[in-house]
């Protein structure tokens, strides 16, 4: 098969592992920088050009689109969909999961466990907003944040009010969530492919750090999931419409709570913590599904 990987840097661990896994199975692979693509949008023959050449005859596309290029990256992916190329994750599913508020609303509508969450732009009553989520301590997030950037733990009401007011001054949309103390600064990353959890790791925040992101010095280790955690992770990925997803859970006194559903989960942490060939499993999934062009929206989204 001819597989394209939408990635801005082919030396990144995840991208290079996907290239290696695809080539070892005899596939032709090309890394495509979505920002350098340009499109011919027409009703007869939609086209994508890259480095002066038309991109043709691709069987599948693996989107590894960074958060900062979501808009243009998903537009390029949508164009591939319109050309009949099989997307590992569809453009509409990626945009759905990248919007933190939209994804929380979709998960809550389906009864998925999550921390009590408030959302605000310019609240005229910050005290009431904090009361709504159970008071301090609270976690306050900028809606556009990634890798733990723009996430603050406010341990007292006074600190929480100050942070909310500061974020409002940035004209930023903010999310206020209850702090799950019993999680102990750890979360669980469940890697879902095709409706199954194929690997899971526990990420523990560095000493004195409540954020467990590996980019922030957290550590990863193998973890055994409960049946409920497995079921929750699969349901969250399905609600987003993602074939490949990293679902982040917190262990709470009331069961697993979904923090985030990531449409472009990194492979390095999970492969090193579990010893599993996750890149190979993604290529296996493509082999089973791309031939039949099984995509729900066919570029309609």
Curated annotation (Swiss-Prot):
Mn(2+) 1 binds at residues 248, 260. Mg(2+) 2 binds at residues 260, 262. ATP binds at residues 141, 178-179, 187, 211-213. SUPFAM superfamilies: Glutathione synthetase ATP-binding domain-like. Signal peptide: none annotated. It is an enzyme of class 6 (ligase). GO terms for cellular component: cytoplasm. Mg(2+) 1 binds at residues 248, 260. Its cofactor is Mg(2+); Mn(2+). One of its GO terms (biological process) is translation. It holds the Pfam family Rimk_N. Binds 2 magnesium or manganese ions per subunit. Residues 104-287 form the ATP-grasp domain. Mn(2+) 2 binds at residues 260, 262. GO terms for molecular function: ATP binding; metal ion binding; ribosomal S6-glutamic acid ligase activity. Gene3D superfamilies: 3.40.50.20, ATP-grasp fold, A domain (3.30.1490.20), ATP-grasp fold, B domain (3.30.470.20). HAMAP family: RimK. This is Probable alpha-L-glutamate ligase. It comes from Aliivibrio fischeri (strain ATCC 700601 / ES114) (Vibrio fischeri).
């Amino acid at each position: 098969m001819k597989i394209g990987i939408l990635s801005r840097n082919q030396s990144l661990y995840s991208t290079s592992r996907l290239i290696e896994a695809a080539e070892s199975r005899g596939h032709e692979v090309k890394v495509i920088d979505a920002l350098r693509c340009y499109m011919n949008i027409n009703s007869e023959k939609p086209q994508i050009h890259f480095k002066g050449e038309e991109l043709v005859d691709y069987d599948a596309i693996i989107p590894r689109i960074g958060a900062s290029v979501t808009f243009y990256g998903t537009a390029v992916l949508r164009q591939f969909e319109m050309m009949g190329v099989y997307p590992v994750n569809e453009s509409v599913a990626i945009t759905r999961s990248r919007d933190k508020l939209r994804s929380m609303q979709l998960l809550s509508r389906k009864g998925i466990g999550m921390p009590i969450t408030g959302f605000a732009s310019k609240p005229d009553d910050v005290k009431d907003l904090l009361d709504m989520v159970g008071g301090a301590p609270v976690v306050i997030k900028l809606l556009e944040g990634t890798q733990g950037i723009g996430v603050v733990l406010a341990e007292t009401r006074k600190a929480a009010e100050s942070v909310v007011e500061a974020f409002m001054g940035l004209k930023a949309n903010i999310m206020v969530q209850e702090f799950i103390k019993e999680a102990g600064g750890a979360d669980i990353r469940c890697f879902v492919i095709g409706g199954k959890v194929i690997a899971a790791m526990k990420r523990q925040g560095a000493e004195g750090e409540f954020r467990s992101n590996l980019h922030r010095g957290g550590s990863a280790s193998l973890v055994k999931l409960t049946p409920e955690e497995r079921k929750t992770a699969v349901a969250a990925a399905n609600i987003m419409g993602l074939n490949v997803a990293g679902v982040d859970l917190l262990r709470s006194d009331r069961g697993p709570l979904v923090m985030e559903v990531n449409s472009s989960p990194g492979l390095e942490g999970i492969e090193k913590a579990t010893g599993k060939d996750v890149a190979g499993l993604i290529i296996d999934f493509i082999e089973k599904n791309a031939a039949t062009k099984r995509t729900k929206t066919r570029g309609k989204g």
